[in-house]
Amino acid sequence: MGEFYTKGEPREATVATCILNTGNWVLPSDYADEVAYKPPFMHWFIAIFSLPVGHITETTARLPSALSLIGITMMFFYLLYKRTNSYRAFVASIILLTSFEMHRSGLEARVDMTLAFFMIGALISLFKWEEKELKGFPLLIPVFLGGAALVKGPIGILLPCMVFGIYLLILKRYSLWKIIYKNVFIALPALAILLVWYILAYKQGGEHFLNLVYAENFGRFLGMDSKKLGISYELGHEGPFWYYIPAIILGFMPWSLLLIFAAFSISIKKSTQKLSIWQRFINLDKLTLFSIISVVIIITFYAIPSSKRSVYIMPAYPGAAYLLTLLYEWALNKKTILIKLLARIILVISGILVLLIACFHFVDLYSVSTLLLHDTKTLHDISLFSTAFQHPSIFGFLVWFLLLCVFISVWYVLRKETARIVLISTLVLFICTQIFLEGLAYPVFKNGYSSRPFAEKIMSKYDLKNNTYVMNNLKEYSNLYGLNFYMDNNYKNFEKEQPKNGYFITGLSYIDKIKALYNNKYIFKELERTSDRFNDYGDVIVLYRFNQTGKEIKR
């Protein structure tokens, strides 16, 4: 799957590194003195999976997300298989599994997929509980809710209960008080689980921990200013209210292309039905109704705060996948041309990949590109693939050959078979395309932007253990999360400790500012630097040795 090439993955993996190195399972740190403000449930899994090898690896760090995606797919398939038919269950599950957002997140060391697993597990269990008329104590629901809360906080409890409560209200089979009572009934055990961690974490982190909890759970939702919250980082990426509409369409690529095709091919006719839209809505079968409600409520809830990321709405993806599958069934019966159009698009994409790899193998595209292109990043990327594909491994060749064989098979099926078989063949082709990308293409790209080579180089030449310092103020400087992970979470906060001597690492773009700030107190001598800025940090990384001059800082 490749090395870490972004800031997010090594940041999460480093929390687990701290757990193994220090034995602190309650409130570990992830960068110098930076406290991991999220509950560390996912990081516990990473640490446990890493115990046999004794340290955190890229694979063990990504394992919770991969297992969560598999678990979500299995729960979703079983839910549909028992209530619809095997064909619909299979198509919906593959659409969910291979959709761009779910597939991507399932292979990353981030908390979002683990959170989605517990929230989706809770939603499915809540749906099944209503089918039993809310009888008995559903043990799995508090477990799923508690797991979601231990991954990201109270939102893991609040949102599934909100979806379920609105679903029960629309069913009109239960009184308002019973709906409230039943939601409280299942939420309290989960809250108790979360409260235990909060108490233990407060004993370690004190008031600073409470400030972080308030900022993350209330400040982020209300769009409060980070300065007023007393935190040294910004609360996420801002986006407009409608952000999640294109986000979920892009997140379901390529399968959401059918939705776009259908939007231009359906003719709007005046309805002859006497029932209103609302009456038709509440008369839908339970599975369709619950799917619509979960998608609408989850997207609307996350649309309210200014901080937005496409992965936040992944708990809505099973419901959306089911609704999208119904659209595919409509196309199979009414608009088979749309299915074949989608198949041709995916066939072309796969064919381009097959041809491109062959070109890279037989032609030095990097040499050709240098004559036509001048963008250094583009040339760097072409160089990575050109070098790798000119000398592919046996595994790489087998993955390429698999894609070629399936490509030829689908090309034949598209000419001869029915739309149903074409759809299944297209699903298989896209799975093989993803296997090709994950097994051959992505690792080349990821490794080309990893900080690991530089970390290994400087650690072999210098004694950096417990003697390496960085700036840790996200409002002023970017953090070197990738390098920190590959150096075994060994950094200390330079500004707070102000040591007499040691090693200092920063980006080339920051060093003049830092030297000016500490001009009269420290002397910095450059030792090593990366050859370019093509790494997860996005800048030339420089290692310095510093010594204190004994003078005061000029501010």
Placement of each model-derived feature along the sequence:
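Membrane-embedded architecture of ER/inner-membrane glycosylation machinery
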Residues: 139, 268-555
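Membrane-integral, polyisoprenol-dependent glycosyltransferases
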Residues: 1-341, 360-365, 393, 532-540
